[in-house]
Amino acid sequence: MLNSLKIANTFESIKHEKISKQTVDKYINYFVDAFILREAKRYDLRGKNEIGALRKYYFLDTGLRNARLNFAYTDEGKLLENVVYNELIYNEYTVNVGTFESIEKDKDNKSIRKTYEIDLFARKGNRLYYIQVTDNINDATTKIREYRPLIMINDQVQKIIVINKPILETRDENGFTIIGATDFLLRFIK
């Protein structure tokens, strides 16, 4: 997944050279045209429309991505999210990155606006899914991070957590589907 603003900021902090977001966008568009990347627009889950400003990009061939990084990038959760995105697209789903805002109180009891993200919002006909993809949910911090947006968005869309473990499909106390990546990719979305 790529975000042009993050790339520009990272380039500046690591290489100590300024590159504009517009230049990064140009290069990303070249990669999209060359079928190296695919764009996933953000979708406001409460407003029910696409948000044009920020986008995520996924690699169409994760092997090329890994080769370019000398197989050194080890965030398996993000790589799995990329694979799940590609498989949904291959199976003719419309896929967006789900977002919504919430007004919350900070520690000083001041109202703050917070944006939450659901990894993938997939649609195909009358099939609608909110999908969180993670390497595992054994760690309490990870579990809270993955569950919180799904709990906060209170509608009838099926909520799924895809885990990079060989587990059988189950439902948890929230009604969320918990499923292993292999089962999800080979059976669930077909």
Q: Where do the protein language model's features map onto the residues?
A:
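Short acidic, hydrophobic short linear motifs in intrinsically disordered regions
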Residues: 1-11
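Short, positively charged loop/turn segments that connect secondary-structure elements
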Residues: 10-23
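A cross-kingdom feature that marks ATP-driven nucleic-acid transaction machinery
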Residues: 22-190
